[in-house]
Amino acid sequence: MRRHRAIPRADHILECVARAGKPLSLSDIAREIEAPVSSTHDLVDDLRACGYLTRVGAGYRLGQRLRTLRLIAGHADQPPLTPDELTELNAVIEAPVALAVLVGSDLVYLHGVGEVPAEIGAVVRDHVPRPLLATAGGRAMLAFLPADERAALLAEHASPGEAVAFGREIDEIRACGYALSDGSVQSALRVAGVPVFGGRRLLAVVVVAAPRISDRPSPALEHAARRTAVWLAARARP
């Protein structure tokens, strides 16, 4: 099924405005999303009319609609793990950790605790979307999603070969309770992704990192991943 192009463009507009740190003009927005000013104007007008954007002089910033939706959702806006809980986990396993969630078809980090290389820290701090199959956290997310959701994501965002290759990993990931990085993205680190559940519902993943010493498996990282799974199970929310 084809998505209406206006929806991803509207999402792109909101992200650009959110990241800008200052009001963006209509021409700025059109340039960022690589679209004609005329069609961008229509989308921006619709977003402003619904409260997602507001005018500030000749520019636009985020409006109050997102805030009111979060208020309406109430408890649903609570993160799967608070920063304090993530700090506690970091102290327990003595390894850097980060919390990430599924946003559309990407893994997005919410926050992290612990020392990591600057380029990796920037991905977490700036909430940079990461492809699911390129990260241990993303593969853990895929492995523990309901089968129909996983199949839909792989059909749209993976090649047939990638989908088949990942299919051979799923049982092993689910059996051990975490996914390990193959080093395709975090070359300085070895990384494990551990699922976070609320009842039977997959909420997020915790990503655990350790320095890459060699290309051989890291018993210390796997031990930290297992301890993370135990810690999460003891604090699982209903």
Please state what every model-predicted region is.
Residues 1-76, 230-234:
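N-terminal helix-turn-helix
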Residues 18, 142, 146, 226-237:
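Short amphipathic alpha-helical signal-transduction/dimerization elements
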Residues 61-154:
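Amphipathic alpha-helical effector-binding/dimerization core
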Residues 162-232:
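Extended hydrophobic
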Residues 9, 39, 65, 81, ...:
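Charged catalytic carboxylate motif
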Residues 88, 97-98, 155-160, 176-183:
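Short helix-to-loop capping/linker segments positioned immediately adjacent to catalytic or ligand/cofactor-binding
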Residues 16, 32, 81-92, 96-98, ...:
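Amphipathic alpha-helical regulatory segments at dimerization interfaces
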